[in-house]
């Protein structure tokens, strides 16, 4: 089971066409995904986070952090004095539903014909919201193929929860003890700490062991006890009663381990890699490893992991190792990643990329581009990190070799048209295989990529080769062929 499509109406930057009634409007954005790894790639503010957040708003996350629609989620036109829209809607469609998954969502499923005589289950869930005059926002979640659908039970909706790794992760805070510890949320969502692993009294083994330890620690500091810790507690209470508290106050201070419930225990835990303080890169890997615990745990229902800015705090070699791991896990579930890393852009197979540009999403698979299978193979070999900046450019100049690569930026700067100021990238193809790169931007759906592309090559005139022959020893008689001499030659045919 995987997320195959998402549609947006009036969500953030994706607004429907003016003058069209909301209930009759086509979606402002329609994105198709495939099972396995999908990578949203594009420049800053191109809409990557908007798509990820839309998925989170509808499906919620496995860790259970609160997610609310606010006023700024409603589309606002860039025109002067425009107002935010009153309604928004997000629809998610799911495909690849097997019989086990179908049993979880039976009353909300639909059926579609595949064209080969077979039928597949499909599931649609929708989140809509209205913004009221008094500032309230009224959300409505429903599921089903036709019309407004039906409400979905809390239990069924939990099977659609996703694993989410947020951008610019504060890995140190997330993996450190505290009331808002992300590590505690992850552990509590793990099956090891589910109700099925508790005894008849509703106690987990960890709670029992912790409470035994707590009794010993608390006893050590008991003011009525005979251990050294009791002397400290007794001295504290003596100071309080004799120096600070009123005579009528009847209070005692104690030193103890706090909390006895499982949630309290998990909030006291840290995830560390080594005794010394780790760098941001190592902490980030720890954070992702912890988050992916939930991915491997979730056996039934949707297995979807959202990762924003996979490259955060990681050097290129670790980025490559991480993406290799995620690709290896792709057959067991779905990953939707965002990035603006040229390292990842050049490493991930082109078919798995979705380029975001100008309120549009351009899939790079064979159903969308004019690339042939040979083009894909060629680009997988030769589209390296120095060429992958074409995914982020406002304009593109493809050049044949090093000479053009050096001269063109210099000439542009001399005439006052610095290419960097205009977001124009130069890609040194290193050959005459321009068409393979251009086919990335040629679309079968005829959508315009809205990016000017130029191809600059040289004439490649061969230099005249000669050698000295003063004695004319190498002279050869050459018969010049013209229209007239052709007639003479034809006369000698047998």
Question: What residues fall within each predicted segment?
Answer:
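Short glycine-/polar-rich loops that comprise or flank the Walker A/P-loop
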Residues: 85-90, 121-125, 158-162, 301-302, ...
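Electropositive, glycine-dotted interaction segments
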Residues: 89-91, 97-208
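Extended helical coiled-coil dimerization/tether regions that scaffold
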Residues: 2, 174-178, 186-304, 328
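Acidic, divalent-metal-binding catalytic cores of TOPRIM
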Residues: 354-494
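Switch/communication elements of ASCE P-loop NTPase nucleotide-binding domains
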Residues: 1-60, 264-388, 396, 405-406
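Conserved nucleotide-binding/hydrolysis micro-motifs of P-loop NTPases
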Residues: 13, 94-100, 131-134, 169-172, ...
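Conserved catalytic network of the ASCE P-loop NTPase/AAA+ motor domain
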Residues: 32-33, 43, 80-86, 116-120, ...
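Conserved P-loop NTP-binding catalytic core
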Residues: 52-116
